[in-house]
Amino acid sequence: MSGRNVESHMERNEKVVVNNSGHADVKKQQQQVEHTEFTHTEVKAPLIHPAPPIISTGAAGLAEEIVGQGFTASAARISGGTAEVHLQPSAAMTEEARRDQERYRQEQESIAKQQEREMEKKTEAYRKTAEAEAEKIRKELEKQHARDVEFRKDLIESTIDRQKREVDLEAKMAKRELDREGQLAKEALERSRLATNVEVNFDSAAGHTVSGGTTISSSDKMEIKRN
């Protein structure tokens, strides 16, 4: 008793290759292997040998249990040839890749423009703040200059006022000195003494009369010095 069984197996492998332009080329390798098996079976009369049951594990034991005693099996496998097939990406895939690249470029440009706009806003805000601060500083400097001028003016006026008061005070002191000198002069005149020699000859019918006297005038001498 004999028979033939034919089995076909298909193996497929896919390979992805990235070329220099950045596109992905998909290459599919298709391998078809045809296996042919031939089985020859010989039937023999079974021999009965009572034996204790044996439980075997593994592929050999399982095959022996399936076939049974008295049967032998032989098989031969023949491998066929292989063929390699290269597949190019379709037009749809190429268009999709082009759209992806264009979208990527647009997103990059959008990011760059957004960052540029943000920098412009920040620069403008910083410029306005700096100008406002500079204006405040300028006004404060003007106020400080006005305060300096007013302070110098006050110093000059204060100095002039002090000198004027000193002159007035000196004039008052000089007048008082003159007043005191005049008072001293008056007192000196009051303290002066007079001494006079007088001789009077008086002739009359009654006779001849002679009278005399001495007057001495003296005064105290005082020196007044002014610094």
UniProtKB/Swiss-Prot annotation:
Region (Disordered): 1-35, 86-126, 206-227
UniProt keyword list: Coiled coil, Cytoplasm, Repeat, Stress response
Signal peptide: none
Coiled coil regions, renumbered to chain: 91-191
Compositional bias of kind Basic and acidic residues: 1-15, 24-35, 95-126
Domain of life of the native organism: Eukaryota
GO biological processes: response to desiccation
Region of interest (CAHS motif 2), ranges: 163-181
Main location: cytoplasm
Mutant phenotype after disruption: Results in a significant decrease in survival after desiccation but does not affect survival under frozen conditions.
Swiss-Prot/TrEMBL induction comment: Expression is highly induced during desiccation.
Any one annotated GO CC term: cytoplasm
Chain positions covered by the region annotation CAHS motif 1: 126-144
Compartment(s): Cytoplasm
Domain notes: CAHS proteins contain 2 repeats of 19-mer peptides designated as CAHS-motifs that comprise each two octapeptides connected by a tripeptide.
Family of the protein in this entry: Belongs to the Cytosolic-abundant heat soluble protein (CAHS) family.
Biological role stated in the UniProt entry: CAHS proteins are cytosolic heat soluble proteins that seem to contribute to the anhydrobiosis in tardigrades, but their specific mechanisms are yet to be identified. It is possible that protection during anhydrobiosis might occur via the stabilization of vitrifying small molecules such as sugars, but not via the direct glass transition of CAHS proteins themselves.
Note in the entry: Trehalose, a disaccharide essential for several organisms to survive drying, is detected at low levels or not at all in some tardigrade species, indicating that tardigrades possess potentially novel mechanisms for surviving desiccation involving tardigrade-specific intrinsically disordered proteins (TDPs).
Listed name of the protein: Cytosolic-abundant heat soluble protein 94205
Species this protein is from: Hypsibius exemplaris (Freshwater tardigrade)
Gene: CAHS 94205
